[in-house]
């Protein structure tokens, strides 16, 4: 704060910092007090010219006294990032290419960064050029910008509709009613904050760590949107012709092609929920055009670097447990998400470890996956433009038409794709051709909207997540990330994070959809230790109607407790011996942890497969069930011990087609 006070060109932002408080409490500190205290802060301070130009634009005067309290907060809070325990951002740490800073600002918005094509200066949020950088102070870095940082207040749908190269998707969002579903729902957010206002700022003590109470539940979305050229080139749509008011004058010709193509890709007389298809009303969720659009939409607003979580994948050296480096990636990393609507689809996002680390939708790959392999990608199924939804490149910003359009909305993000994405039978078949390993965080989409995954630890009230229901009153839900808890390092979790549920827990978890009808083996992965619990698992197609599957599972066991002692450290054994040991372990309902991820802090070299037999990482085979797309399935977990301080560990699941389980070639160890 001293630097700002000493610079007369920053007097306006200094004045606002002295007026604006951090938080709604009556005793909340002003930003000037916050910035004068210890911490790690990144400040993009607008100079006086920038502040006055912004105030003039808002209120027709340069007088700061004309600003409302909301306007003052908008200016002041948007330019500050609280980096917490991590280092503040100097310019060498800035993301480029339209990617966003990994930590949100004080308005819970992720800020993008590009470089000016002329002088290579950094540009924040599309128009705030850094005219001075890297003023290092005792508690962070200050950068001076020439515009006030003011992220869009439009919804995701509104930004799509404003993009001049997405007129077709913008119109389809409106006609199908999905634009209304993507609207800003601040009333829900405010209701949650009001209900839990007395818990704001409080913590719960658990596993020797103070867990902050999750005081917000933001409602946000992610959309993948075709540019107009995708429909023109892939489906033969006419190019949109637009009048002076922005209306598409040849819409009927475009709609005719869209409707025809959607019928081709969804030819069934019933949708996945066995509802008769409505061919006339696009707002009916069984309508083929509605289903086409819905497959592009996700609950949870994610900046592009939040699609996957890098932490302990094979051969990746994260360097820092509390802030893994965003470089040196080694293997493909992916996650799965359920799309919106009653006809939930399964959408896979993969990041490659090469080049600029691009992201792809529904990339189906083959790997060097032998026992002595490296898991490097060998090949990927090629894109068939307009015919499938396979292997589509995601663009981080919308600049595909020579003009940059804002894709960072108040309630989420949209990302351009250059080919039409369809969830037809070929796409589903390819998705169902591989083992689906799904992290628990992606099942609980509210986490995606809180800028929490991999960055924060938290305690959640037991009614927080839509996909966790029928929760007993004594159940407590915690989210943990290695590096952020007091007990850090040497974890054996997939992606380095986990949920722990304690108390006399009893809850039901909604599972992701399967892409094709068929029989699937369902597995649950966990890192075991003597603080865990024992529980009964139930399966069913209704949260209120589940049946027990198998015997109770004990997450406290060591490998010596498995009947017949089939677990063997096979790191020096022959391939034949390894396969035999794996079969013996499967016969008891267990599998070793995948070779794909490693013990935290081992620089990606010590895989969890053979680590610490007294507290192993294992997969339990829960059940094999016939499952259909369009139907919802649930697992219930009920504590089987009296102790209320024991932990149920929720990490990841695998859904494996029986064609892989029963194949002649044994399943890979990855």
Sequence positions of predicted segments:
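Conserved, compact domain cores that house catalytic/ligand-binding motifs in diverse enzymes
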Residues: 20-21, 172-218, 458-504
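FKBP-type peptidyl-prolyl cis-trans isomerase
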Residues: 44-54, 136-151, 224-234, 404-423, ...
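Extracellular/periplasmic catalytic domains that process cell-envelope and extracellular macromolecules
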Residues: 35-37, 105, 116, 136-137, ...
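Acidic/polar, low-complexity intrinsically disordered N-terminal segments immediately downstream
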Residues: 1-104, 118-120, 131, 152-193, ...
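Non-catalytic, alpha-helical, charged scaffold/linker segments
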Residues: 193-217, 237-240, 247-250, 270-278, ...
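Internal, charge-rich low-complexity segments
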Residues: 177-196, 233-261, 541-571
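Extracytoplasmic
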Residues: 372, 376-388, 420-670
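Aromatic/histidine-rich interaction motifs
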Residues: 52-128, 244-399
